[in-house]
Each structure stands twice: as C-alpha cells, then as structure tokens.
C-alpha cells in the first residue's frame, strides 16, 4: 500500500495572495457579506490602482539603472551590468550595437553611493566587494539575474497589493545564497536597489512610501530564517506521515480558525456557533431553515458546554441523521462523518475497516463518539476550536486517496451517494500487471504510451499498478526466444515470423583494429534506406539526408551502429521525437526506434528520465546505443528492427474475421441521408422544388429604378414608389409639406440620388412619429429593415448589433447605417427603390420575412423574430386568500 496512487487530478494551488482574493475568500468562507472595513480596504486598493501602475512603469523603465547601481555597489574590477541577460525584445538589436546602462544618475551619484549608506542602512558585517574577473561569467550572469528577479517580484507585489508573493518566494533564500556567494553582499545590493528606486519618487511621498514598504519586506524576509515544514500528525501506522513546505501554506488563504473563549463578546460567540453549523451541516441551517437548538447554544455561550461537546451533540442530533446518515449507506455516511468531524477523508483501508465496524455495531452515535474522542481530534481541535477542512495548503495531502479526498472536500460532496474510499482502497488489492506504469488505459493504441496526459477530469479510481510493475511485451518471432526467459537468444534472428533483418557482413580492412562493412553500392543503399525507415519512421527528403555519413558508410569508414547513432542525433530526429513531446513520451518513442521495443516499466523510464534531465538528449542516445542490449541484439552491422510490441498493438494489426468493410456503419449526417435522391427528376420538377414555399408575388414584383431625370413620368413613379416603400402607403396628401417638397425638388434637380432621398424620408419627423415612437426598439429595427433592406432581421446577432446602435445614437443613426451598408449598395445601388426581397437563405429567416410583410403594420406590436418563445405572465397572489 506504499506505492499506490489515488488518481492525479489537475490542481492549481494558490501561489500567492492578493488583496481582492484574500478579502473575498475570507468573507466567502464565513458565509457572509463584506464588512465595512473590508470594503474600505478594497476601495483604498482600487483607488490607488493608477498610482501603483505608474510606480511599476517607472521601476520597469529604470530597472537596468537600478540593477546597475546595485551591481556597482557589490562588484569591482569590471562592468557588471554587461552580464545582465534581458528578455529578447520584439525587435532584435542590430549586430555591434549592444549598449549597457551603468547608472542613470551619473558618475557623481555612483561615487556618492560608495560612501553614503543612506542613513538608516547599515553595512552588514562580513561585506566584501566581489571581483568580476575572479567570480566568473556564469556566476555573474546568475547574480545579475537574481537582482533583476528581486525587482520584478517587487513590481508583482505592488500590483497585487499584498506582500505575500515576496514572503512566499524570498524567505529561505539566505541559506541558498550563502552556499553560492555571500548573504551580506546580497543584503547590500538590496539596500542599494531600495535607495536607487526611492530616488525616482522624491516628489511623491505616497509613491515613495509604497516602494519603501515593499523593499523593506524583501530585506526583512531575506534576513528571516528558512521556515520549517508543516508535519502532518498521524495517530496510526496505517496512515501516511507527510510534510508540507511552509511556502505553500503561506501562499494560500488559510481557513479561519474559530475558537470559543469566555472573553468574547456576544456577537463573536454567535459567529463561532455559526461556524460549527457550517462545518457539521455544510451550511448555516439556522439562517436557511430557522433550525436552532436554543438550549445547547445558550450553554455554549455561558461556558457550560465546550465546542467539542457541542459538535458531538449536533452530530448525534436527529437533523444530522436525516441529512447525512439515513439517505446513505454506511460506508458513505462514514466518509461524510470524517469530513465533518476531522476535516479530511479516510486515509487507509485499515482505518475504513475500523470505523466501519463501529458504525455497523452502534450506528451513528458510536461513530460520532469515536471520531470526537479520537487522539487526532484532540491534537488538531482540542476542546474549544471548531473543526475545519484540512484541504490542500492547510496540510500535506495523502497520495493514496488524493482524488477521492479532493472530491469529498468539495461543496457538492453531500449529493454524491456512491462511496468512493472503500472502492478505492479495495482496488489496490487487485493489480493488473498488463499495464503501463504511467497510465490507466492499458495502451489501447500503439501511439498512446500511457504517459502522463494532463486532464481536467477528476480521476478518483486507483491506478492499478505499482512502481515495480512490468508490461507484457510480445516478441516478433519465436516466443521461446523471449529475452526475459532466454537472454542468450537476443542475437538470434526472428526468422520468418518476425520482420525482415538488414545486415552487412564485415570484411577485413588494412587496419586490423577496425572492422569495415561491405563496399557494394546496392547493398549499402538498401541498408541506408532501412536505417532511415527504422529510426526516422519514413523516407527522408534529399535535403534531410546525412550525405557525409552515408559516404563514410559506403566507404567502410564507419559501421551501421555509428551511422544509426548519427541519424538518431540529427536535427530531423530531434524535431520529430524529442522537441514536440514531454520527456516520458519522447523516451518511449526513442526506445522503440533504437532498441526496437517499448519500455518495460517505471524503473526503466525513471533511469532514462534521469539521464535526459541531467545530461540531455545526446547522452540519452549514447546510453541506448552503447547499452549491452543493443550490442547483443544488433551488434555493429545490423539495422535495428522491431523486436517486441504490446498486446494492444498486436490486436490492432490482426484483422478480425467477423468484421468486414461492407458491414461497417456509415458515419453520415442524418440530413444527408434523408436528402439523398433516389429518382430522376426533370427540369420542371426541379424548378417547382426550388420555388416551393414562395408565392407568385415574387415573380410579380416590379422594381422601380430612376434611369433618366428628364423623364417626368418615370420620376413621379419613382417618388411614389419610395413613399409606398418607406411609409407603406400613398402619401399624396402629405407631400405638400415643406419638408418633403424640399427633398423632391432636390431629387428632380439631380442634387441627390434615390438612395439619399430614401435616407432623407427615413430621418423625417413623420417617419419617427409613425414607426419609432409607438414601438419598442426591437420592433423599430424590424420595421426599418423591412423598409430599407426589404427583409426581416436574420438572427439575434444582427438585432443586438442594431439595438446597441439605436439605443446609443438614435433612429437617425440606424437609418444611416442601413442605407450606407454594403448589402444596400449591392442589392439596390444608388437609383433603385428598395423593394421586398424573398431571401431563402438562411431558411429560418424566410418565414420571419413572410410574417413581417403579411401582417399590417398597425395591427400588432409583436416581434417577428423573437429570441425565445413568449410566455404568458402569471398572476402571483402575495397574500393568501385567508389573509
């Protein structure tokens, strides 16, 4: 049970705290609204936002000068700032134009800083400047990088409004730096950076105070000793003893600790009692359901009953039994009781068995007594502390119940009826040896190596393997020659049952200490092709071939083994099997290509992973090529071939007799299947189907277009058509108005086009009175699109677009936008009167246009293209009939 894992869900623990997150989480954990002091704190932080950004911009723009002053203070004998490696900017600097900033304040300021310690800054004992030439390039680069990181962390903390990010990342660095150089030197550099940064804010007292505050935190935390780890207490040998680094606990927002004391006020005692209800019932049942135990609460407030006994009484209450005992089976009720009374889930199979026997024997009261009277409860909560959830960040979490515990501590745990821990621990007793140690899928595909795929889903089941599990591999060839049962058979050829083997026989050379291969051009070209196919996985392009090494192989200067090694170290192989993948998957690929088999298990992957991490890609290739297994299996002049494969890979290569191509289900969309034509149709039949649903009115539509202004009759027809289109009726009696007379005369005098005449009518007072004032905005948009584009709105996106325009700029802007649109220009142009169109695409818009045109304008105010089906309003009686 020591090597098992309860699933590995993807978690992102909190790395630092901010003002907003800390304040809101504290209120959320206590199930309350923000108090006036917290709101004031947030308001102060948000009000200072612009000033904080200005501070950060100033520090960022002068970061090199600040780091330069600090470096000049602690380094001598060179230009230390030249070793600062800055992130590559968007525009690469030209060659030969690199410049370095020594100090923005000039030589005098730098000379003054040597003798002026700033009044309050005291040079620590043991400080001695470091010689640049003796310190070395690598150390100089790391030192300048660290100084730059200190300044960068300060800018992060200023934005967050909380120095927690500095506490989390800086405390404990002194011991690490002490091993590399000197903590006194680092302290002097930080003091100089503080002095240099404050010099940019001498005219702004508030900004200077903010910068000084965060620099003081950096110096204080740097001098503080490294925090000790949080050790998880355990009361049984079956539980895992774990420890959590202090920095993780400092980064998260801690659960509030509620402790009852006799000196608390009445309001504070009420808050503690509310916390007990929230922990035991997972919500404040007093506020939600007005359920209170006045007798117990009064005894707690008067000091007659401790919090521990109050928790025990609530756990034995009828309400708790109804909520968390009666609806569940015993194993699930046990898991929920662990959450409520100990703040965690069961940690081992032995613990589940122990408490399961208690709940089976004495029911819920005996289980509650056992948990509350346990030594663990006494050590964590005592008599007066309210139990709390011991989540990630509060203490170290066990790996054996990782996924199940995270799900148990979730807010929705009480809605899960199925027990999780008992099935999880039972699964550990049934290991499946035929499984890859880094996954649960048992390699269903050859390309899925079961490595660590990051998934957002929560896996609470056990991974059915241990660290010593070995995968089953099937030999391609005689099974009796498997290298595990018969290691001496590695050199045997697989024969007709395995893959084809390419091999060159060695011949004598002038140098007796070396071996050369055959000089035949045909055979060597076949060997070269086989090497590319095995190592690269395909034939290579001409530009990707290793011509120099191919010539050496043909001339007998190198062996096939050396040629394989060079191909495996090529940029092509690296780009295919190393760069795109994480290390575990790359190791699996490379192992298959070079040794001809998948990896056996976790121990082999761990060994290769360690080599790749410490020595790099080329050392990994050398390790595999120089291994005894490669030497025994292929030797010097044999091309590597596939020797073993997984059961899943073998199953994929075998054609099953009861499966045929003709019986495979067709993966076609339903509308394609229903739309298939099984008959021959004539032209008339096709035309009828094209025009189905469209009345004869489309064919009878007359389009009015102004071709010549001199044709008075045609001009009069166009003007009347515009009035009928825009106002939906003849306007002879309204045309005598001065407003319309001006528009008509300008059209007749060729001063405006038909398009501009239409826009002028749409922006008139009469149009606003008839089609804007009486209707809601959505109906106004539909009518405007009917009058000026000849159709209804296509969808809700179009309605939202014009609704925003109408609400912000008015009806005139809406009309101008429609008439000036690309659609209007393409359909009507400058001199065509808008007319009713019959748009059949999208099909869902056609009935909306029909409904819009077939209903009289003054008949209804309903919307033709609603976003949802309208519901009838219901009448709600606020008072009961008897009231």
From Swiss-Prot:
Source organism: Cyanophora paradoxa
Family to which the UniProt record says this protein belongs: Belongs to the phycobilisome linker protein family.
Localization terms from the record: Plastid, Cyanelle thylakoid membrane
Enzyme Commission number: 4.-.-.-
Single GO term (MF): lyase activity
Gene Ontology terms: cellular component: cyanelle thylakoid membrane; phycobilisome
Transmembrane segments: none
Keywords: Antenna complex, Bile pigment, Chromophore, Cyanelle, Electron transport, Lyase, Membrane, Photosynthesis, Phycobilisome, Plastid, Repeat, Thylakoid, Transport
Post-translational modification as stated in the protein's UniProt record: Contains one covalently linked bilin chromophore. This protein autochromophorylates (Potential).
Binding site for (2R,3E)-phycocyanobilin: 181
Biological function: This protein is postulated to act both as terminal energy acceptor and as a linker polypeptide that stabilizes the phycobilisome architecture. May have intrinsic bilin lyase activity.
InterPro entries in the cross-refs: Globin-like_sf, PBS_linker_dom, PBS_linker_sf, Phycobilisome_asu/bsu, Phycobilisome_asu/bsu_sf
Domain PBS-linker: 238-418, 488-669, 684-861
Pfam families in the cross-refs: PBS_linker_poly, Phycobilisome
Leading EC class: lyase
GO terms for biological process, alphabetical: photosynthesis
Name of protein: Phycobiliprotein ApcE
Gene designation per UniProt: apcE
Membrane topology, record value: Peripheral membrane protein
